[in-house]
Amino acid sequence: MLSGKVSLRHRRWRLRLLNHHLPLAFTALLAVVLLYRVLPRLDAIWKLSMATAYVGLFLLVLTLVIGPLRILQRRRMPLSLDLRRDTGIWAGILGLFHTAVGLNVHLRGRPWLYFIYQKRESHFFPLRHDQFGLANETGLFAAGLLALLLATSNDWSLRYFGTPGWKRLQRWSYGLFALTVAHGILYQVIEKRTTTFVATFLVLALMAITLQAVGFFLRRHNDRSKASHQWMDQGPAI
């Protein structure tokens, strides 16, 4: 019995590896390389930061829209969907890599200055509260949430926390998305990004927001319809 369960888990993992992880890894790496090659500036660290940021954002958006798209197709929505989970894993890997690279773009070798003012700058409160500081602080909080979600995107965590606890934990992905959008908007302004970058960012963000909203209202409508049908089937209480 136990060996059968282990064998089933191994088979499921092999299928996820072949059908999800390898294609996602190859596609993400290819996209990063292509974007790196076409970016105009010569600075390698900036180009790598931008390439991983936009590919990571695309994967995060894809993770968030898989559920609503299944609802629109009237397909059953399981508690944990392997494709969504595996896409989220690669979004997390790229996002954390972007964080590590991004901390070396503007202030080489002095990453703490992304979050606190230099000593020679006179500020009563040492934490940066200008646009640059807020952009980096939202990015840091997003990276923290990303690490948490990445660490718990597995079957062991689902069993450990139980269904309600794991679902509550995974809902922090919406907070992650909000922080990512805030971080992105601030950097569009700080770096005075070109129209192409701004348009790409807005399209991806609005796609996720729109489909999430549609999925939310459809789910509520379906839940109300089910409750109504159950009440009609049971009949009025006497």
Show where each model-derived region lies.
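Membrane-embedded alpha-helical bundles that constitute the cytochrome b-like, heme-associated redox core
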Residues: 2-238
